[in-house]
From Swiss-Prot:
Residues 103-175 form the PRC barrel domain. It comes from the Bacteria. Transmembrane segments: none annotated. This is Ribosome maturation factor RimM. PANTHER family: RIBOSOME MATURATION FACTOR RIMM. Keywords: Chaperone, Cytoplasm, Ribosome biogenesis, rRNA processing.
Length: 175
């Protein structure tokens, strides 16, 4: 999973998933959920879907876990051809709907855009996006070049300062 490039700059919203495909012929959609557990995405409304750079609010008519994913029917999307236009769209919800992150936890959307510096104060770049790899999340940092840094609190990531917009890492800048 990738998160970041299409994320809204409006910090009032948090990306929680994306439309990943079609399901059936009546306009149902497959959803890849970024929430843990994955079915938590069904608890939030309205969804804000990004299509062609614009965000549109949509309400859930129905939704359920289906296999390893989620399938949903959204208001105003009743046909497969119409549903196909939404495949690939990001899903965001208003931040007020989500619980605040616990100590030492962060929403990915809060990390995107932070300046990344080493313990020695050398600037590596900015967090462009994050990747979910299974073993651990990975920060994609863009500066003079792109770097992939494991998001391991304490080992690699030493400090996250959202107020200052800084993420301090124990990382060799030549790596």
């Amino acid at each position: 999973m990738e998160l970041g490039q299409e994320a809204t700059d409006d910090k009032r919203y948090v990306l929680v998933g994306r439309i990943s495909g079609l399901y059936g012929v009546q306009g149902w959609l497959r959803v890849y959920s970024y929430t843990q557990p994955r079915n938590n995405i069904l608890d939030y409304e309205p969804w804000y879907l990004q299509q062609n750079g614009a965000w549109q609010a949509r309400r859930l008519r129905k939704g359920r876990v289906q296999g390893k994913g989620i399938v949903v029917a959204l208001e105003g999307i009743d046909e497969r051809d119409v549903a196909a236009l939404w495949v690939g769209c990001e899903i965001a919800v208003h931040r007020d709907q989500l619980p605040p992150p616990q100590e030492g936890e962060y929403y990915w959307s809060d990390l995107i855009g932070l300046q990344v510096i080493t313990l020695q104060g050398e600037v590596l770049g900015q967090v462009d996006r994050l990747l979910e790899t299974g073993a651990n999340d990975v920060l994609v940092v863009r500066g003079e070049r792109e770097r992939l840094l494991p998001f391991l609190m304490g080992m690699i990531v030493k400090q996250v300062d959202l107020q200052q917009g800084l993420l301090t890492v124990d990382w060799d800048p030549d790596f």
